[in-house]
């Protein structure tokens, strides 16, 4: 073994972290010894860090600090990081049933420019989640009584409004989601309920009847609680922005997470950007059996922005997170100013995309009409520079006279193939798989039990600015179990709805979609809702009627601007 004379760590070494003072002892802060160890490993290769069984605590006081613009999160700010994995090669972090417990505002894992990174055998949770819970004691249209455990979820009532702790501050309740007592899933026909005039929401007067019992009264004539609310249901009380994902992976190659469980994160459980070849195997976002909260991650289970190579999600369980299980997309930047036929300034429009890199010299861009969502020019980047986190200046190698303000660009260098198989997606807020990748996509042998569209294929150049016209998606041998029971989150179990405002001749934004050999358990007629796609094959599927929920109006196949639709051998 080669040995680094500066650190004394041999290439290929296995390090039991307890030998470095990282110990599974009650409340002991392991952040500083972990930081020192990771700093020693910079420039090293083929290292394994071994975490023996036990609970390891991490606090933000001695953590590494970085300014991060994390895609699809709510703030661009200095983040404290526990596992700062920077430019590592062939690093393995191996847990032997190790539990990592994080405290306060701390980002557990940040990997930047790593190659061949493997993480396994860990569970992750926070000592105090960033959301709270309540149980409905009684409810009518104007008054609701809530039971809140003040030890588990401390609260204050200030000027008649409910507040919860956020670090050293107290944040007001700004929305909640009601969960069915029996199913531990969102209530049928519910929606997010917002609070406060700043959110255009309800403005109840809150009063504590006794410790742990709070009454909310709506005094404005026009305001009502939802008719679907009932005693015994639990409320997820949201009073924190999505700030810290559990795993944030940026500009890496060959990332493999196996046998990892995330019980909570104050953002997404896993997000990767500009990363090639990712495998998530038996990666779980699930309820902690020792602390049975009704929610897990505060946002998506997994999210992939401008990734490449192959993305594999296998044998995973994603449940009870507060947004979609999987979202795969690129980013559209809107043309702000055309500075000639070969130069332009573009804007990152959505607040959660600020600061994201749109490309490098030599990579190819596509220019798209935001009305039809169709591309009309491709060119390599001659030069590119960020003017600030909002605006980017770009010079193209090939000129184009058609470019105009309001149109958008996307980077063609990041188009992953995707395989999602043998997974369970259930009981979360919102939808299932959001798939906008021009690579080859295979979705098979999965179980979907989600309140919105189980599979959503979009592409949007006018609101979220998430790019990715599909070319070839196959959805086969899956079970769709009574999905799309919340109207706000989808029109049908499988939905294709790019933001194109009009068609253009025989061209369509999306390419081919094959839906075959699946089983649909449906409480109404709706199965497929599609717009602006070239070809759909719906074959050899079984559709079974259930009485799980009251039917929602809609056709079995609701299609517009679909060039070719083939239906055969379904029953």
State where each predicted segment sits.
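Extracellular beta-strand solenoids
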Residues: 51, 58, 85, 95, ...
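Acidic Gly/Asp/Thr-rich repetitive segments characteristic of extracellular carbohydrate-active
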Residues: 17-50
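Short glycine/acidic-rich loop motifs that flank beta-strands on beta-rich extracellular proteins
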Residues: 102-108, 128-132, 244-246, 266-271, ...
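Extracellular beta-strand-rich solenoid/capping regions of secreted or surface-exposed proteins
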Residues: 35-42, 57-92, 101-120, 128-144, ...
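Small/polar beta-strand repeat architecture
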Residues: 186-242, 378, 383-420, 425-427
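Ser/Thr/Gly-rich low-complexity blocks that favor extended beta-strand/coil architectures
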Residues: 102, 126-127, 151-207, 354-388
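Solenoid scaffold repeats with emphasis on beta-solenoid/beta-helix
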Residues: 15, 47-49, 83, 91, ...
